[in-house]
A protein has these predicted regions:
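Mature, structured domains enriched in cysteine- and short glycine motifs
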Residues: 1-103, 112
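Hydrophobic/basic alpha-helical segments enriched in Actinobacteria
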Residues: 55-56, 70, 96, 121, ...
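Basic/polar phosphate-binding segments, predominantly the helix-turn-helix DNA-binding elements
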Residues: 73-77, 81-88, 112-148, 168-190
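Terminal helix-turn-helix DNA-binding modules in bacterial transcription factors
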Residues: 102-106, 112, 116, 135-172, ...
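Catalytic cores of secreted or luminal carbohydrate-active enzymes
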Residues: 182, 186-205
């Protein structure tokens, strides 16, 4: 309880010592509440990641996957941040931000959607919405939407046999080219390479493995 309270005292900048204690024992209570960016690898992980615990000086802690990705870290291929419980993005947010997150999850910023249109749907100005997101989440609405697209697409790559064109569309990418460019930039490999890696890792008899 003491560790949880210590983390909660700072919504946007979780207490590093408390977070590292949770990371060192892979405390599942923090899954979805915090993410750790490892500066020596450029990867961000869930606190329950099975990889060897990094040194404290190599860790940066974030309250959301979007904040970690905005800081330049890419998602871990082992613990798969896209499967973490969606707790942190809703904790301590205002009603406007919570509604905005729900609309973003529904695709409000996909395709031709803009932050100005999102703000209008929420009944606030664009600048006010950006300020609220920065205040409560530490990132912009666009950053949240971009992270959601990447993590949702990555989940579909791992957990389905859908063609890449359908995954790009379902995740809200404007084009397959943009989809491929984003994954190449983040993971230094095309989406198809992640699909091959996922298929190899699938246990025999799983739904995705058997088609």
């Amino acid at each position: 309880v003491e560790v949880i309270d210590a983390v909660r005292t700072a919504d946007l900048t979780p207490d590093p010592e408390a977070c590292y204690r949770a990371l060192s024992i892979r405390d599942a209570r923090f899954d979805g509440r915090i993410f750790v960016g490892v500066t020596s690898t450029g990867i961000y992980c869930r606190p329950i990641c099975p990889a060897r615990t990094p040194k404290p000086e190599n860790c940066r802690f974030f309250g959301s996957a979007a904040a970690a990705q905005e800081a330049g870290f890419r998602p871990c291929l082992r613990c798969r941040p896209e499967t973490a419980p969606e707790l942190a993005t809703w904790r301590g947010t205002s009603n406007t931000v919570s509604r905005g997150l729900a609309l973003i999850a529904d695709g409000a910023l996909d395709g031709d959607g803009s932050v100005d249109q999102l703000a209008s749907r929420l009944g606030v100005g664009e600048r006010q919405l950006r300020r609220l997101f920065d205040q409560h989440l530490g990132v912009s609405p666009i950053a949240v939407a971009q992270t959601r697209r990447v993590l949702f697409a990555k989940q579909l790559i791992h957990d389905s046999r859908l063609p890449m064109t359908e995954i790009a569309s379902a995740a809200g990418f404007g084009s397959v080219r943009r989809f491929n460019e984003t994954f190449q930039q983040l993971f230094k490999r095309p989406p198809s390479a992640l699909r091959r890696k996922a298929v190899v890792a699938l246990p025999e008899g799983s739904v995705a493995a058997t088609g």
